[in-house]
Amino acid sequence: MEEIGIVIVGGGIAGLATSIALHRKGIKSVVLERAEKVRSEGAGIGTLSNGWRALDQLGVGDRLRLNSSLIHKARTMLIENGKKREFVSNIVDEARCIKRNDLVEALSDALPKGTIRFGSHIVSIEQDKTTLFPVVHLANGNSIKAKVLIGCDGANSIVSDYLQLNPKKAFACRAVRGFTKYPNGHGFPQEVLRIKQGNVLIGRLPLTDNQVFWFLVHMQDNNHNGKDQESIANLCRKWADDLSEDWKEMVKICNVESLTLTHLRYRAPSEIMLGKFRRGTVTVAGDAMHVMGPFLAQGGSAALEDAVVLARCLARKVGPDHGDLLKDCSMKNIEEAIDEYVDERRMRLLGLSVQTYLTGRSLQTSSKVLRLMFIALLLLLFGRDQIRHTRYDCGRL
């Protein structure tokens, strides 16, 4: 049986970022990715200042800035019964939209060759009865014993199942994300614009002068699976039918291949607060740990923060002399490092989880009473500074 110091399950944003963070601390890791190549599905990721701090610690921030534009303002419009209410806030700190594909490529390019093992489909995880370290079983019949196993395998995480975390919950809505190109320029201001009209929430973020990332959420329509790209595009056109002409045009001329349809899910705040995110030397990061709705645009940035904090905590305990973690590093030291990581992340993630949940529910409900209640709770818990979460600093790697 092959033995590896640190095994990371999942080659998405969280997994690649965690591997880079460990690499920059002199600690080797192997990333097991189910797909046959780097996963590039998905449209854009709104990345706020806390995410850019983490990207700079990972050494890829400057590369990603080259293909993204600064966002200067956030604007939300609520249209009800023909009446329009508008809320505007200036963005002082760094905020940009980046292509998910650009981010994944930047992360994968920063890793040593051979770090990512493609086509590695994990079917089960068990604990070795003698050493108590985790053993990963692959679909090809091979097994790997790891000193540390980090699950970065998304919302349907097999590692979170091993940790016996409670199942994720679902918002009663689906979201579509996509890109639209404007060959002659879009002419939109450099702002995040969200419009809530009826059961539809739509928003857009300029990526460059000629390209826009947009999202479309239907708060009640939960019955469409989107069998192919064209059916997703038709669904978007249907949802956007009551919107103004510029929004309908944006959806109509979009890059159909860029569209992704997702059922919005979240890990309950109570699970974030009380969940056991370590079992032996196994833990999770990214969506496997804290999948959340897109309402604060913090899912991707929170995963980047996880990577920095986890690598820092492990490096503090094992040191660069144990780069492959197969030498003298004890299970106790590893467990203590993971506990430090979980403790440091828990309250940060709890705040994001609660704020995201309340924001999503306030947008989703059709009851004015419930909406006012959710807004009152947001003000009570987070004050008038509702973007304070963007100023969080995960610290130096």
Swiss-Prot record:
| Domain of life from the UniProt record | Eukaryota
- GO BP, sorted A to Z: response to fungus
Give me the Gene Ontology terms describing cellular component: endoplasmic reticulum
Task: Name the tissues where it is expressed.
Answer: Expressed in seedlings, roots, leaves, flowers and siliques.
Q: What is its EC number?
A: 1.14.13.-
Q: Which GO terms describe its molecular function?
A: FAD binding; monooxygenase activity
- Give the keywords, sorted: FAD, Flavoprotein, Monooxygenase, Oxidoreductase
Tell me its cofactors: FAD
> What induces or represses this gene?
Induced by A.brassicicola, especially in cv. Di-G during compatible interaction.
How is this protein organized at the quaternary level? Monomer.
Q: What is this protein called?
A: Monooxygenase 1
What is the organism of origin for this protein? Arabidopsis thaliana
